[in-house]
């Protein structure tokens, strides 16, 4: 049976639909909903069976932890055993917002939700629809991104319906999300806070607030024997159906390299997609070219990344070449997602031309 789709925004809430969605969560069902980052696939975080349903619907490995979403700061103390001072400072500054913190879990949180770990990842989203749903659903909603595991995360309800329409109970359509990349994840179970996933709240912002904060060295791990402490650390994520490579180097060299690679692929009968910027989109030939935005507007690049990857799926391209996007504030987050989507395939434009 197809999921029921209901439309609403934070400015135009449908409280009857919210109550119905909350009842679905309380009964152990699954509801996809908008947040300020990407769409989430929600289940009752305190119900082990609901968490297992999330893993099954997504085709997600069960050792990949789920983030527990709350809608009231006081709820944090119910699902954790310790809240370090640094975590309290970040919560006061960045919650509600695109920040997830990993803390020691209380017994009330089942291991099915935490991927077998003694820690729990917690977030307080700023989206009003998300907040009202969490309250209606009992206060604790486990929610990874609402997509088939490994695929680009959904930034519109249509993406959710495409991936999970037959596997879940309801989709709340809140329009296109604001940020377009998942939340920053900070681990407070170590001596020094560690960023396990970069996001809108950058390492520099965290260091300005707390002082010593580090970036995890394992952000690029793919070793199957490693147990991930946070969503997205171990498994390939965000990937389009076509083979994706990132071309790095000076702009002129990148354009020449992508055009040459495109020409070679077209000669082999392949359909090519190119992820460009507003500044370069007219310079590519023989390819389906999609601009991800201007290099002067990095938040726009982040906002459009997953949408562009899904658009190329719709266009049925065989191979995708992308420029690199090492922008000042969100470059870490953007390139983290792009590298994972490409399986870390990088082409050096300078070396290619030799």
PLM region spans:
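Active-site-adjacent structural elements in enzyme catalytic cores
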Residues: 1-354
């Amino acid at each position: 049976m197809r999921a029921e789709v209901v439309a609403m925004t934070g400015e135009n809430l449908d409280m009857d639909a919210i109550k119905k969605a909350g009842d679905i969560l309380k009964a152990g069902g699954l509801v996809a909903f908008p947040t300020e980052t990407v769409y989430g696939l929600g289940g009752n975080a305190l119900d082990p069976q609901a968490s297992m349903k999330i893993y099954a619907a997504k085709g997600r490995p069960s050792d990949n932890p789920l983030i527990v979403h709350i809608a009231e700061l006081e709820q944090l103390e119910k699902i954790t055993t310790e809240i370090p001072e640094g975590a309290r400072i970040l919560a006061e500054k960045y919650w509600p917002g695109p920040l997830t913190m990993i803390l020691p879990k209380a017994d009330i949180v089942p291991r099915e939700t935490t991927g077998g770990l003694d820690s729990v990842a917690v977030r307080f989203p700023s989206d009003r629809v998300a907040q009202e749903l969490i309250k209606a659903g009992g206060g604790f909603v486990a929610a990874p991104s609402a997509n088939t595991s490994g695929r680009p995360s959904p930034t519109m309800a249509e993406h959710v319906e495409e991936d999970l329409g037959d596997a879940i109970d309801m989709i709340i359509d809140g329009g296109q999300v604001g940020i377009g990349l998942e939340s920053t994840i900070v681990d407070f179970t170590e001596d020094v806070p560690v960023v396990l996933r970069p996001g809108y709240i950058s390492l520099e912002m965290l260091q300005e607030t707390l002082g010593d904060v580090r970036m995890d060295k394992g952000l690029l791990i793919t070793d199957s024997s490693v147990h991930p402490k946070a969503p997205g650390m171990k498994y390939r994520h965000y990937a389009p159906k076509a083979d994706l490579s990132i071309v790095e180097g000076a702009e002129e060299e990148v354009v020449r390299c992508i055009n040459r690679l495109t020409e070679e692929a077209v000669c082999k009968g392949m359909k090519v997609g190119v992820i460009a910027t507003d500044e370069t989109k007219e310079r590519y030939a023989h390819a389906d070219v999609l601009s991800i935005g201007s290099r002067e507007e990095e938040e726009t690049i982040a906002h459009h990344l997953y949408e562009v990857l899904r658009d190329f799926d719709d266009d049925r391209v065989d191979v995708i070449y992308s420029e690199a996007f090492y922008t000042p504030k969100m470059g870490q987050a953007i390139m983290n997602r792009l590298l994972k989507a490409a399986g870390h395939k990088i082409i050096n434009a300078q070396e290619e031309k030799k």
